[in-house]
Amino acid sequence: MRLKHLPSEFQEALPVLEKIKAAGFEAYFVGGSVRDVLLGHPIHDVDIASSSYPEETKKIFPRTVDIGIEHGTVLVLENGHDYEVTTFRTEDLYVDYRRPSQVSFVRSLEEDLKRRDFTINAFALDEKANIIDKFNGLVDLEQKILRAVGNAAERFNEDALRIMRGLRFAAQLNFDIEKKTFIAMREHAPLLEKISVERSFIEFDKLLRAPYWRKGINCLIASQAYDYLPLLQSTADKWQQLLTDLPEDFTFSTSEQAWAAVLLYLNVENPRSFLKSWKTSNDFQKTVEKLLAIYRLREDRQIKKTDVYQYSATLLTLVEELRQAQGLAVDFEHIKELDEALTIHDKHEIVVKGGDLMAAFDLKPGPDLGKILNQIESFIVAGNLANERQAILDFVRKEID
């Protein structure tokens, strides 16, 4: 098969392929970018595979960076872009179900493509826009099937993260997982306990944010992979409830919204501890906790202006979206009106600072000054005090007197 048109991202990288070939080696575009162009999706990173060994690649290009030379990868800086050029390679036994014990460089493209995870990721594209398809990936792409390259059991035994990648691809592409591939995923799911939590989170997060996340969750349940992920043991019924409650066409707007929904349906008592187990950042944990706090607040009452100031219209809107998906009462317009009525959205916007008050009224740092600053903030947020220097100073003068 040949592409009618080579996308600009590949055209910009053509000089790299041409220089490698001019030096007597083979070079191809490989990986997700080739799959994405075949699907008509936006192209992200353009990766190149070559028969040139790392030291040979470095001799071809004046500007390179060693970023993974032990695995055959050299970063080539060309025409204002940087491209990862990786030597064709085979991999020995995997020591920890994630990394090969040894990488061997080879001159054969087919040997290199054999080690890929799924047939739809095992394409190569040459400089003339010809697609090299050694494993019938084009057929699988057309039939929307996710199939492991070669022996599925071997692929997942080599790298158990491929199980999560498979679930994620099903969710992103709306592909069905081929029967033998799925059986191997289910049989090898216990190996997910060997995988770093951070890597599992990245894949799971992409699954939740995907347009067909429901398919991903259904596959997660059917494969029983959840039993081998942090704090998700025996949660099939709760995942099923999430699928039942949220409509078919609902998609999550942000990762934080998605994980807040997950924690809500899993009835997690300590969200911070749960998210720490998934090795998420402090900022991520705080945002999810805020979303859950807003959700609980909304169970009791409507949103007030102070809520918009405390949590932000953005987070309040995310919770309203989730409530709307659940068929609960929502008021997006009310949040918008309250947000527009706020004269400040952060205390740093207050024109008078603590130092100004200390100078104007001979105040000392301490609890009393903090109390006055909090009063100023509360009055401005409530709309009872203008955020103007003179108005604030007059207010403080009255409070002190």
Curated annotation (Swiss-Prot):
Function in brief: Catalyzes the addition and repair of the essential 3'-terminal CCA sequence in tRNAs without using a nucleic acid template. Adds these three nucleotides in the order of C, C, and A to the tRNA nucleotide-73, using CTP and ATP as substrates and producing inorganic pyrophosphate. tRNA 3'-terminal CCA addition is required both for tRNA processing and repair. Also involved in tRNA surveillance by mediating tandem CCA addition to generate a CCACCA at the 3' terminus of unstable tRNAs. While stable tRNAs receive only 3'-terminal CCA, unstable tRNAs are marked with CCACCA and rapidly degraded.
Transmembrane segments: none
Miscellaneous: A single active site specifically recognizes both ATP and CTP and is responsible for their addition.
Keywords: ATP-binding, Magnesium, Metal-binding, Nucleotide-binding, Nucleotidyltransferase, RNA repair, RNA-binding, Transferase, tRNA processing
The protein's assembly and partners: Homodimer.
Annotated protein name in UniProt: CCA-adding enzyme
NCBIfam families in the cross-refs: PRK13299.1 (NF009814)
GO terms of molecular function: ATP binding; CCA tRNA nucleotidyltransferase activity; magnesium ion binding; tRNA binding
EC number, as in UniProt: 2.7.7.72
Disulfide pattern: none
UniProt-annotated binding residues for ATP: G32, R35, R116, D159, R162, R165, R168
Organism field: Streptococcus mutans serotype c (strain ATCC 700610 / UA159)
Gene: cca
Residues at which CTP binds: G32, R35, R116, D159, R162, R165, R168
Gene Ontology process terms (BP): RNA repair; tRNA 3'-terminal CCA addition
Catalyses which reaction(s): a tRNA precursor + 2 CTP + ATP = a tRNA with a 3' CCA end + 3 diphosphate; a tRNA with a 3' CCA end + 2 CTP + ATP = a tRNA with a 3' CCACCA end + 3 diphosphate
Family (UniProt): Belongs to the tRNA nucleotidyltransferase/poly(A) polymerase family. Bacterial CCA-adding enzyme type 3 subfamily.
Enzyme class per UniProt: transferase
Cofactor requirements of the protein: Mg(2+)
Binding site for Mg(2+): D45, D47
Presence of the UniProt keyword Flavoprotein in the record: no
PANTHER family for the chain: CCA TRNA NUCLEOTIDYLTRANSFERASE 1, MITOCHONDRIAL (PTHR46173:SF1)
